[in-house]
Amino acid sequence: MVYREPFTGLIEYISRNYSGKIVEVCSGKMFRVAIELKKRGFDVICVDVKAIDTPDIRFIQDDIINPKDEIYRNASLIYSIRPPYELYKHILKIAEKNNADCIIKPFYGEIPEDFRLMNYRGDHFYIRKFSKNHPKILK
């Protein structure tokens, strides 16, 4: 069996399908995906309700239940890795309001409603498309 770094498929999917500004919400202290996407030329912003020191990644403290709209404006993608289930609807609302696609990589066993399951190169995550460049997957 070949060892794969965690989130390799997710990083590759985002790299192939998005450009420009992307925002990771509920980032916590795990920045592997954000750092790799920044290396690939993305304008990455990490957001969390708690102030966190980040390793060379732009970080903005924000409460996604009452978000500051300017943080998310013009993002092509809003994504979150293992956010609390009760925040899914708020993440989705931010993405829809900003016409950005939304990806959630949930904890094992959690399934976001109104999202499509993706299996990309062995990584499983859920997507909902809102961007002007893509048709909506689900209403």
Language model features by range: what are they?
Residues S19-K29:
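Conserved class I S-adenosyl-L-methionine
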Residues D43-V49:
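Conserved SAM-binding motif I beta-strand of class I
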Residues D56-D69:
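Conserved SAM-binding strand-loop segment of SAM-dependent methyltransferases
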Residues V49, P83, F107:
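Short beta->alpha hinge that forms the Motif I/post-I loop of the SAM-binding pocket
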Residues E86-K139:
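C-terminal substrate-binding/active-site "lid" region of AdoMet-derived donor-dependent transferases
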Residues M1-G20, L138-K139:
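S-adenosyl-L-methionine
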Residues K29-F42:
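Conserved SAM-binding loop of SAM-dependent methyltransferases across substrates and taxa
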Residues D69-L77:
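A short acidic, Gly/Pro-enriched loop at the edge of an enzyme's catalytic core
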